[in-house]
From Swiss-Prot:
Any single GO CC term annotated in Swiss-Prot or TrEMBL for this entry: chloroplast
Gene name per UniProt: RBCS
Name of this chain's protein: Ribulose bisphosphate carboxylase small subunit, chloroplastic
Tree of life domain: Eukaryota
Keyword Membrane belongs to the record: no
Annotated compartments: Plastid, Chloroplast
Transit peptide segment: 1-57
Keyword match Lipid metabolism: no
Length: 180
């Protein structure tokens, strides 16, 4: 591309127009794959997104209102028990301690204070203690099911991967959403 532009700047206008028409036909054929509505559910996609106003209509912004998304995997369909077990196995193999937390609201808000850096909803209620020394996902899944029995009707439940050497949360994903 750079060599074509450089050669077009040096040559006569006739040669430049010939070079640009050759390149524009190639560019059009490349951009022909960028069509809006190629993926299924076009009408649903358009109701939840907004266009950025440019001619490339496939770049859109996700509508943030009345369309809550919570954690890392919340854009996917609800995870099956096997998928949850694989995610928890990854947390355990990474050397992180699985933790289970629950919360009624499930989102980060700013209601209690307007100070910079203050947000409500960052800290959820912990279910029991972090599972330090846990070696299998089955025990974590049992604890999740026990938490669902008590709080599943009205609370969001998430699983964390906590790195106790760095004292940070390394992974977090929703494992249960309440029926609204």
């Amino acid at each position: 591309m750079a060599s074509v532009v450089a050669s077009a700047a040096v040559v006569t206008p006739f040669a430049a127009s010939a070079a640009s028409t050759t390149k524009s036909s190639q560019i059009v054929s490349v951009q022909a794959g960028l069509k809006a509505g190629v993926f299924g559910g076009k009408s649903e996609w358009q109701t939840k997104t907004q266009t950025n106003g440019s001619r490339v209509s496939c770049m859109q912004v996700w509508e943030p209102y009345n369309n809550l998304k919570f954690e890392t995997l919340s854009y996917l369909p609800p995870l099956s028990q096997d998928a949850l077990a694989k995610q928890i196995d990854y947390v355990i193999k990474s050397g992180w301690a699985p933790c289970i937390e629950f919360d009624v609201q499930g989102t980060v808000t700013r209601e209690g204070s307007t100070m910079p850096g203050y947000y409500d909803g960052r800290y959820w209620t912990m279910w029991k203690l972090p599972m330090f020394g846990c070696t299998d996902s089955a025990s974590v899944l049992r604890e999740i099911e026990e938490c669902k029995k008590l709080y599943g009707k009205k609370c969001y439940i998430r699983c964390l991967g906590f790195d106790n050497t760095r004292q940070v949360q390394c992974a977090s994903f929703i494992v249960h959403q309440p029926t609204l």
